[in-house]
């Protein structure tokens, strides 16, 4: 989790947990159904749905399963009463944490989220307590490319910013509504998109030391273990030196 990379620091991913296909598939299907319900089943006109489809495909979900989930969202049914809820709180070291949930039972969800904060030395805040520290953005990851050519293509496609990373990759930021069109423009210019999603970008970050970094990672792990939690965002910054000791 390199300190220079927002992509690496914003969301902590656990490969071992993601390998539990049943659990991750359940969350992916929920997002597909909800995205289709809210914005319709046309991927080209629904950025949230397109991001959900891309994520499902990257996790080896079949097209048939994806299409069935979209059809359920468009057609209605027992599983389309899911609602998105954002919980905000404070994690170890004074970090700001936002927890995006998809649930049909708010009481059940809060009973999962609140203890996770408490057990890790944090506390669940009120609505708006840390949300002002984040901005909703589209984020595109390019593994490697010629910087000048990619910058030109990204600007032409409507990107807001492009940031080269120490490992040779590039992070491209867009207005979240423009994620799909910017991605299309970049791909049309011949570049391969490794990952693209709507995310929350912190305006400020908190440097974590060897004592606080493991506590934040434990909090993220506990939250991601909750069935109703879709995404966890934070503003913790873990530098390479600290990460190498974890």
UniProtKB/Swiss-Prot annotation:
Domain of life from the UniProt record: Bacteria
Family label: Belongs to the TACO1 family.
Name used for this protein in its record: Probable transcriptional regulatory protein HI_0315
Gene Ontology cellular component terms for the protein in this record: cytosol
GO process terms (BP): regulation of DNA-templated transcription
Single GO term (MF): DNA binding
Location in the cell: Cytoplasm
Keywords: Cytoplasm, DNA-binding, Transcription, Transcription regulation
Keyword check for rRNA-binding: no
